[in-house]
């Protein structure tokens, strides 16, 4: 926790100073800082670290034919591996490739740190007027802990961020290809596909009012309908067991 606080403090100190001279230099420095923070953490750091590490060792023990045979042709389903290690196809392939190249689990962490830090910095530099402040906000709103804790979701998010340019340029096919690639690491990113049609919707006060009313109604009904809705949604991803139970106190 102290490391995360120091990281945010350093960005706040040198960010505005360096950015006033060169935004690219500033983002590069912050990117290196984020990379080191994510890459040099202990393998055991994070709530799911043991499962990911054990999964890496298990996948690394597979032969090429075994790994290939375990892949599921259905992108919305997991690879056909034993429970706890039956990750998405892309995650299985990535783990196997890095292990085959001689990298340990720490090598996977370093690879993910590089992709994550570069993706966040690329996104901030391209779409933010003050990229250092965007990265500062990212560092203070639990995104780094998110990046450390849930590796597959973070990789899927990082890939998705590269696809935003296709929303801006109005290239739906390329955008969906990026979404499909990201889904190979975590299927929940399919929800991000909604951003393309939403980005073309002009917001008015009336629409915002309707959205607010719908949100209030949804919150009021959530205790009654959310458990069943969650079961249906999570069922699509093979995660029915994660459905929560809601009740009024």
Regions found by a protein language model. Give the residues of each.
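Alpha-helical transmembrane segments and terminal signal-anchor/GPI-anchor hydrophobic tails
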Residues: 50-53, 60, 196-249
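Transmembrane-embedded, aromatic-rich helix segments that form part
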Residues: 5, 175-178, 188-199
């Amino acid at each position: 926790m102290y490391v995360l606080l120091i990281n945010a403090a350093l960005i706040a100190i040198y960010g505005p100073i360096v950015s006033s001279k060169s935004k690219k230099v500033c983002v590069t420095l912050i990117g290196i800082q984020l990379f080191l923070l994510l890459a040099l953490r202990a393998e055991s750091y994070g709530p799911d670290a043991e499962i990911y590490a054990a999964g890496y060792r298990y996948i690394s023990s597979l032969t090429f034919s075994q790994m290939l045979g375990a892949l599921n042709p259905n992108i919305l389903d997991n690879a056909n591996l034993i429970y706890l290690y039956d990750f998405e196809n892309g995650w299985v392939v990535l783990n196997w490739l890095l292990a085959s190249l001689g990298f340990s689990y720490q090598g996977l962490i370093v690879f993910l740190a590089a992709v994550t830090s570069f993706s966040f910095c690329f996104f901030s530099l391209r779409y933010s007027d003050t990229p250092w402040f965007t990265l500062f906000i990212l560092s203070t709103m639990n995104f780094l802990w998110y990046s450390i804790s849930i590796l597959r979701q973070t990789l899927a998010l990082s890939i998705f961020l590269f696809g935003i340019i296709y929303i801006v340029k109005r290239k739906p096919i390329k955008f969906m290809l990026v979404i499909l690639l990201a889904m190979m690491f975590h299927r929940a990113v399919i929800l991000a596909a909604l951003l393309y049609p939403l980005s073309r919707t002009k917001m008015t006060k009336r629409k915002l009012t309707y959205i607010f009313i719908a949100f209030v109604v949804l919150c009021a009904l959530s205790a009654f309908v959310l458990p069943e809705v969650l079961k249906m949604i999570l069922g699509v991803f093979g995660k029915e067991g994660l459905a929560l139970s809601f009740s009024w106190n």
